[in-house]
Amino acid sequence: MHQPKKRLAKKSWAFLTAALTLGVITGVGGYFLFNQNKQRSSVSNFAYQPKQLSVKHQQAVDETLTPWTWNNNNFSSLKITGENPGSFGLVRSQNDNLNISSVTKNSSDDNLKYLNAVEKYLDGQQNFAIRRYDNNGRALYDINLAKMENPSTVQRGLNGEPIFDPFKGFGLTGNAPTDWNEIKGKVPVEVVQSPHSPNLYFVLLVPKVALEYHNLNNQVVKESLEVKATQSSFNPTQRLQKDSPVKDSSKQGEKLSETTASSMSSGMATSTRAKALKVEVERGSQSDSLLKNDFAKKPLKHKNSSGEVKLEAEKEFTEAWKPLLTTDQIAREKGMGATVVSFYDAPYSENHTAFGLVDHIDPKKMVENYPPSWKTPKWNHHGIWDYNARNLLLQTTGFFNPRRHPEWFDEGQAKADNTSPGFKVGDTDHKKDGFKKNSSSPIALPFEAYFANIGNMVAIGNSVFIFGGNGHATKMFTTNPLSIGVFRIKYTDNFSKSSVTGWPYAVLFGGLINPQTNGLKDLPLGTNRWFEYVPRMAVSGVKWVGNQLVLAGTLTMGDTATVPRLKYDQLEKHLNLVAQGQGLLREDLQIFTPYGWANRPDIPVGAWLQDEMGSKFGPHYFLNNPDIQDNVNNDTVEALISSYKNTDKLKHVYPYRYSGLYAWQLFNWSNKLTNTPLSANFVNENSYAPNSLFAAILNEDLLTGLSDKIFYGKENEFAENEADRFNQLLSLNPNPNTNWARYLNVVQRFTTGPNLDSSTFDQFLDFLPWIGNGKPFSNSPSPSTSASSSTPLPTFSNINVGVKSMITQHLNKENTRWVFIPNFSPDIWTGAGYRVQSANQKNGIPFEQVKPSNNSTPFDPNSDDNKVTPSGGSSKPTTYPALPNSISPTSDWINALTFTNKNNPQRNQLLLRSLLGTIPVLINKSGDSNDQFNKDSEQKWDKTETNEGNLPGFGEVNGLYNAALLHTYGFFGTNTNSTDPKIGFKADSSSSSSSTLVGSGLNWTSQDVGNLVVINDTSFGFQLGGWFITFTDFIRPRTGYLGITLSSLQDQTIIWADQPWTSFKGSYLDSDGTPKSLWDPTALKSLPNSSTTYDTNPTLSPSFQLYQPNKVKAYQTTNTYNKLIEPVDATSAATNMTSLLKLLTTKNIKAKLGKGTASSQGNNNGGGVSQTINTITTTGNISEGLKEETSIQAETLKKFFDSKQNNKSEIGIGDSTFTKMDGKLTGVVSTPLVNLINGQGATSDSDTEKISFKPGNQIDFNRLFTLPVTELFDPNTMFVYDQYVPLLVNLPSGFDQASIRLKVISYSVENQTLGVRLEFKDPQTQQFIPVLNASSTGPQTVFQPFNQWADYVLPLIVTVPIVVIILSVTLGLTIGIPMHRNKKALQAGFDLSNKKVDVLTKAVGSVFKEIINRTGISNAPKKLKQATPTKPTPKTPPKPPVKQ
């Protein structure tokens, strides 16, 4: 506690310091003892001194704890409404000496033992608390569970209601909450307030190891991620190995027959369909087996041996990825899971904190409600289990299997082998015994996926929901955990009992497909009755927008791509059903052939185009020949596979069938707000990363009323044996009363895609920067690591960069728009090489020079200045005069890349994914060496390797993002050779090569969602990668349509980092109502490079771009983007690989980013902190700032106070600004520091008006106490009745009494004593603000509070009257009270009796001193000048109290 000045009674500090740390007193308050019996005029000393609190806080406020947020959720602080308004915020200690590696893991220890040891170590190293603030932003006290001496649960009455007295506080049982020892060391990451009681709160706790996941021992986490420094033969990107199968012509067991048009349903249009193959599956005499022509017989040989299948974790693959803990371990070990604790808090009471219930978020509660199909072995994605050929496509349980999505399986990849396939193994005939009821590897919720799901807690009614996090808590390179569902804790009406349940999104938001009714019952996710799709989300947040509850984020739906449960003759009858996505995708149309299972090469794509009966944008199926697809050659896409054999430990791309012949399914994007669900036919498999925007209004009443247990029927289960399962029919007319129908109204409105028209997307709608030219490094096909060879340096295809050089040929085409943001000048680059305007101008070409309206000399791609020619080589064209007219054989794709059709949903999807960097694309070249990509005629689509064809294969490669591919195929490590494809460049290993791997340059994953920002009552938005996405008028849409705007900043900087998401610090609403985002590159982490001790080969990968505000509107030659990656000499071939690596070393990158060295970081030279606002820095006196003599911008202040988004608005409280986030970020003050009266400073009124408590000798006790003391105030509101207020307070003439009130804090009927608190009304919000006071020596000092407060809570006095100045610095808690709107209240001075002090300089100086101490603002003023010349030499301010 603090040591007060001597003339203050020590006890009078007891409550004061417990209640205040940072804030300003805006008036005076008094606590008086009135004793009717003694009839004397003096008043006893009465400072509010709570007794020894039963719930004891070690320190009222621990000044070493600073604000922070968890990177997995949307929470920064909670605004509290109700009886004692204010807020809760998260605070933590900053320990730079944390060394988790000091906790050793013995080889005999399991993960749980190790995690417990880490947790114990962290207990002594870190402190976490929630901090209670009052309505002025003053910190009252910290609730630190770990330091509570005797925590107690609340006493309850007969009906279970908590016992509470406004003065004494909560009744306490003396008993600690349930499992206190397990939960007291956990970290609070979110707090919500109950809508039922202003004093009831819920805190979400997670173990410390979840926060430190990325820092755990690499034997635990890194090993799980298969990043090993020692074993060079191990390749983390490969996970478990597969062999390429080859055709087995000896197998002819399939019964194949042609179907003719006459066998098709007469009601179906046949003009667009070719003949399909009929496949029958016959059951043997035994119902659980198939006939001897069993499809499961091995139809494919393997390269190594005919029977061996290498799928187990053996031989050189010694490690399979495993989650940190299994579902059972989390459920059993309560200290290792998340917990929600209810607690009661009333800050102005004696016992002000008491605990309620403790609920552990048991992952099994979610798993129990998984659909039965998630627990049963599914067919492999060719439709049938096949033990011997299972490694063909690494299938185990459908597409959502442990090999592709190990985060959701308890054994990770360890079960992704042939040990427990669910049927007998070892039978030579491989007969099936039928399927086990439960798979050995059901979908579960182990550590990584579980903590991805913990976040965004909301209290609705008598329930608390955890809607899911954004996945960053446990996100690493080889894992992409996402939220899979919603947890709910349901309480009884008096919150005395509770129950936990969980629902997967698949059921909560899923509607059954019914082709007869256009199927989707207005729900976001279309599914089938087996719930074979596993939707997952990166949740941005769940917030109240206006009066609606909105969930927003990004979503992947995914599918299992299993064959339909129809015989093929039925399939033929129901082609429309097939096309509508009844469990069908590209792979579903694979026919059983002697070649194995594959799409028939002789079925034209047109066979699957739909007629008018189908969906407008149905799926289209491309040629898919297994001989090409799975037995690729080195000079085609085999380069993509073979390159995984290198040992670069950070190559974290998991290869999966990179095929030049892959079809690419798209979401049906729409700007409609209703009935445009994500149905299976638009989903690209169960991709890793989210690939659609998603926002929905939820029905909170239905959510609170749903049952704990979901009951599935027999219809939701697969048939019990394989033959029956293969022929299991779909329900074409599902019963409307199916057991999940009750969920149909959970979502009231949703959107799954943007209206891109007239958005900022239009600035590059027409040309995506993803067409690379022929070579990996400019025109050189052979990058080399030898110092003697020379290789030109690469450029990056990027947004506003990589625009086609021959752009003028396209700009005037019909329907093509090129809309730039104002004053925007992109550089004209291509992926082919560094673009120079001339030999002397090496900084790119301004857009103005290539616009069609410009008469200047057009850019000449044939000029030698615009080529990068290897020494001794011949120059080749590096730009493309025209994009291909067609990129696919289907009509819907014709404009998909040239983007002249604005309403093309595929185009929209392509565009978003290209912005997010999630589209690696293989494009096969066509033509000979003279016109490889220049063909402007229709390319043939049935050729794969020859010059006369160009069949682009659009393969989204399972949602992998370009950062991974850039790293894997980029310029890193020792295996840089001619066979490594380079992202965005031609993978040209030989003249016969025909594949180019192309990708966009904005390298974000769509998992990189920021926190949800409420912009107004109908709009909201969040940061997605480098873009801020605004959902405009979502709550009250205009004519049923939604406007989604994507806005970025104009200046770009490439950041090279392993974990780019660590740099994003959050978005908030600026004072002018504009959403802004905050970045801190100093928070970027890189994985250690253990293979080298020096910084030659950087360990950082180009993972994302950081946008910074462009403060110069004109085109700038010093563009930071150019400078960061600009080659040393762009026109010379002299620089080689070494130069590039040198250029990209961590040290150089840091220098480019302005991060500097450790010494310069201290004074924040550059600091590496980038904001989207100009920070208000205080380099001088406050009043100077208002005169614009310093960097405080008066206009900003004016805008703030004039705007409707004032600092008391609903949106601002702590949800926005991030101050000293992790100890490295400099203080960001987003609210103005001061506001003097009308911006002018002091008034010069000579008459002193006073508002003060009357001294005892002026109080009419005879009038006051003719009645019992309880008659003086309203027992319900505890406010002194209006008629008695003037008897206690001196009010100036003409003063509006309605602007103050007296709140009763304590009273005694026995002694006839009364304690009151004076509260002022904030004229802007009309809320009353309590003003605390520390009176110590009677009425004479009650009115001289200024020398009794700690220095840093002094108000400013400018002569007389007093002007109250509000300083707001903590947590962005928007503390300001612009009382100047109420002139009379402000001009009412305080009676200083016999003291006149000039406290202006003292107040300002000491306040700023304290702010500096508390927030670490390094550029705070060195000296504060006086605002008025009345006292040239200020008195030395008393020293603030020091800790004992």
Curated annotation (Swiss-Prot):
Residues 231-283, 845-885, 927-949, 1419-1444 are annotated as: Disordered. It is found in: Cell membrane. It is a single-pass type I membrane protein. Residues 1431-1444 have a biased composition (Pro residues). Pfam families: Adhesin_P1_C, P1_N. Residues 1-30 form the signal peptide. The chain crosses the membrane at residues 1353-1373. GO terms for biological process: adhesion of symbiont to microvasculature. The keyword Cell division does not apply. InterPro entries: Adhesin_P1 (IPR022400), Adhesin_P1_C (IPR004940), P1_N (IPR022116). Residues 240-257, 933-946 have a biased composition (Basic and acidic residues). One of its GO terms (cellular component) is plasma membrane. Residues 258-272 have a biased composition (Low complexity). Keywords: Cell membrane, Cytadherence, Membrane, Signal, Transmembrane, Transmembrane helix. Its main location: membrane. The keyword Transmembrane helix applies. Residues 851-860, 868-878 have a biased composition (Polar residues). Belongs to the adhesin P1 family. The protein is the major adhesin mediating the attachment of this mycoplasma to the ciliated epithelium. This is Adhesin P1. It comes from Mycoplasma genitalium (strain ATCC 33530 / DSM 19775 / NCTC 10195 / G37) (Mycoplasmoides genitalium).
